[in-house]
Each structure stands twice: as structure tokens, then as C-alpha cells.
């Protein structure tokens, strides 16, 4: 899988950064693209990338603030003409996302040529699709804001060839049945496939956060994640200023990384008061501390393998 950032600024765009938008490419598990938040100008950012809107099957909105949703109506309209015709779309988000989209479409007299399935979250959500499991949990941002825990399908354990030979089953087409079915038959006897396979392995886990100040659900979402995408609107200065505005400080994110055993962290939603030079200087200062965990400040169009 691969995470690509189309917007990394907080609140307002800058000359170097667009507002929030993240794409998750599901290959090799699926050929679909999932988007997380659609800030203003997202569709224009996507034009500079190989990703096509027609491959976007799901959009997950973290919360209803403008820097996370103002690009949604335009992107949905353009999808009709960029390979999305008659291809269903699932839109997941807080209560109000359906009304926002439908009112935007109605008032602008825009007509979509594909169906949208809306899923509005209350407190939490568990959603299954193509072997993926997505959990949404409520954060602390003053308005309903959610973090998404995306779990890729399990990988079936390796076949125990010796065990199969011991029951007289030599390598051949039957092995595929052992790998892909719960049971198989050999010489008139039914066997449990799991007895002839190694343990299944959980696929990669990606945690993608909306805006939040520290809260207990953060650890639920990010536990043992392979990749965590988290906001740090404030990357220097007093921590209490970030929390007063229901945002996270870089120190909050570092604490979460250690508590939740996160392998790699990608930090986005940086305040527009920081320019590229500021961010680079702060990064160099932070990584000189041996206690600093593994992280990156991301910029627009950065991509990371999961």
C-alpha cells in the first residue's frame, strides 16, 4: 500500500501547501484508491499525479471544518467525467456530510452520473470492504472529529508441506484448496485447513487522524500501527496553546508514538505560520535528540510505502 499527500497545511493554504487531502492506494490487496479528507483544490492537486478519480471508490471525511471538505463538491462533480461514470462511491463521515454534499449539488445544479452511498458516523464505526476493516473512533476537537484505523486483509499462513505429505497428499493443485478453503477432503476424510497452515499474519495497519487534542481514543486507533498519519498544528512553542484550540503539539504526537508502539509516523496539518525553512530547521533540531521517535514532516505530493 502507499500513502500520498495532496494537502498538508492547516486551516489555510500556503504558496507551498494545499489544505488537507490524503490518498491511500490499496494495492496489492485491491486496485482501489481511498481518499481521506478533501480540502479546497484537491482535484487540481490530483491532476499533477498518476492517481485517477475513477479509481477512487471511498472517501473518508474526518470532520466538517472547511480545510477538510471545501474541495469535496468539485471533486465529486469532476469524478463523473474522469473515469467515474456509473462507478459507485462510498462516502463516510460525520453527521451532516450527506446534507452538505446534496445541498452543494442541488444549489449548483450539478448532476452526478454515479451513485453515492453515505455512511454517517455517530460515536464509532466498524466497516468491512474487500477484506479490509476500517474502525472510526471519536476524537477531541470541539466538533465531531474522527480517526480511522485501516486494517488490510490477513495473509494466509504458509502451507506445511511435510504435514500434508504425512497424510499422503503430495504437492499439486489440491494445495491451493488447502490454502484458500477452511476444509479440504483427501481419501474420503475431511481435514481442517488451519491444521496444515502456519499462523495467518495481519496485513498492514494505517492510522489516519482528524484534528484533535490528546484523548484516550488516540491509542485505540494507533495501537501497533505500521504507519500513523497525525496532525501537529504546532511544532514549536507552548503546548498549551495547541491544546487550547483542540489541536496537537509535536510533543503530544511523540508521546502517542511511544505509548501506542507506532512504527512510522507522518506528521501533517502544519500551521500556515511555518514556511519550508522553518519546518526544516525544527526537524533538524528535533532529530538531534536521541529520544525523538521515527517521524517525518510531510509536504504536498510526498508518498510513503506502507
Curated annotation (Swiss-Prot):
Gene3D superfamilies tied to this protein: Ribonuclease Z/Hydroxyacylglutathione hydrolase-like
Matching InterPro entries: RibonucZ/Hydroxyglut_hydro, RNase_Z/BN, tRNase_Z_dom
Domain of life of the source: Bacteria
Reactions that this protein is recorded to catalyse: Endonucleolytic cleavage of RNA, removing extra 3' nucleotides from tRNA precursor, generating 3' termini of tRNAs. A 3'-hydroxy group is left at the tRNA terminus and a 5'-phosphoryl group is left at the trailer molecule
Cofactor: Zn(2+)
Binding site for Zn(2+) 1: 63, 65, 141, 211
Keywords, ordered alphabetically: Endonuclease, Hydrolase, Metal-binding, Nuclease, tRNA processing, Zinc
Coiled coil location: none
Active site: 67
CDD domains for the chain: RNaseZ_ZiPD-like_MBL-fold
PANTHER family named in the record: ZINC PHOSPHODIESTERASE ELAC PROTEIN 1 (PTHR46018:SF2)
NCBIfam families: PRK00055.1-3, RNase_Z
Chain's role: Zinc phosphodiesterase, which displays some tRNA 3'-processing endonuclease activity. Probably involved in tRNA maturation, by removing a 3'-trailer from precursor tRNA.
Assembly and binders: Homodimer.
This protein's name: Ribonuclease Z
Organism, scientific name: Staphylococcus aureus (strain MSSA476)
Amino acid at each position: 500500500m502507499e500513502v500520498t499527500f495532496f494537502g498538508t497545511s492547516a486551516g489555510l493554504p500556503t504558496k507551498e501547501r494545499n489544505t488537507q487531502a490524503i490518498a491511500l492506494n490499496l494495492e496489492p490487496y485491491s486496485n482501489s484508491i481511498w481518499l481521506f479528507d478533501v480540502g479546497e483544490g484537491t482535484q487540481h492537486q490530483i491532476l499533477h499525479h498518476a492517481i485517477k478519480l475513477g479509481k477512487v471508490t471511498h472517501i473518508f471525511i474526518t470532520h466538517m471544518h472547511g480545510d477538510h471538505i471545501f474541495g469535496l463538491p468539485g471533486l465529486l462533480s469532476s469524478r463523473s467525467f474522469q473515469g467515474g461514470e456509473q462507478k459507485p462511491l462510498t462516502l463516510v463521515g460525520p453527521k451532516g456530510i450527506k446534507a452538505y454534499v446534496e445541498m452543494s449539488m442541488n444549489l449548483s445544479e450539478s448532476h452526478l452520473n454515479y451513485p453515492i452511498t453515505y455512511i454517517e458516523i455517530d460515536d464509532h464505526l466498524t466497516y468491512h470492504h474487500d477484506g479490509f476493516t476500517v474502525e472510526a473512533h471519536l476524537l477531541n476537537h470541539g466538533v465531531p472529529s474522527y480517526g480511522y484505523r485501516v486494517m488490510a486483509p490477513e495473509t494466509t499462513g504458509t502451507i506445511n508441506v511435510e504435514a500434508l505429505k504425512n497424510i499422503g497428499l503430495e504437492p499439486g493443485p489440491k494445495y491451493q484448496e488447502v490454502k484458500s478453503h477452511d476444509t479440504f477432503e483427501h481419501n474420503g476424510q475431511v481435514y481442517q485447513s488451519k491444521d496444515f497452515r502456519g499462523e495467518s499474519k495481519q496485513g498492514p495497519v494505517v492510522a489516519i487522524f482528524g484534528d484533535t487534542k490528546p484523548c484516550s481514543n488516540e491509542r485505540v486507533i494507533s495501537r501497533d500501527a505500521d504507519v500513523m498519519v497525525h496532525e501537529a498544528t504546532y511544532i514549536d512553542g507552548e503546548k498549551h496553546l495547541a491544546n487550547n484550540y483542540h489541536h496537537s503539539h509535536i510533543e503530544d504526537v511523540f508521546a502517542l508514538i511511544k505509548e501506542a508502539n507506532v512504527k512510522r509516523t507522518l506528521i501533517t496539518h502544519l500551521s500556515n505560520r511555518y514556511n519550508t525553512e522553518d519546518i526544516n530547521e525544527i526537524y533538524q533540531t528535533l532529530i538531534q535528540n536521541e529520544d525523538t521517535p521515527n517521524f517525518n514532516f510531510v509536504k504536498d505530493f510526498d508518498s510513503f510505502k506502507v
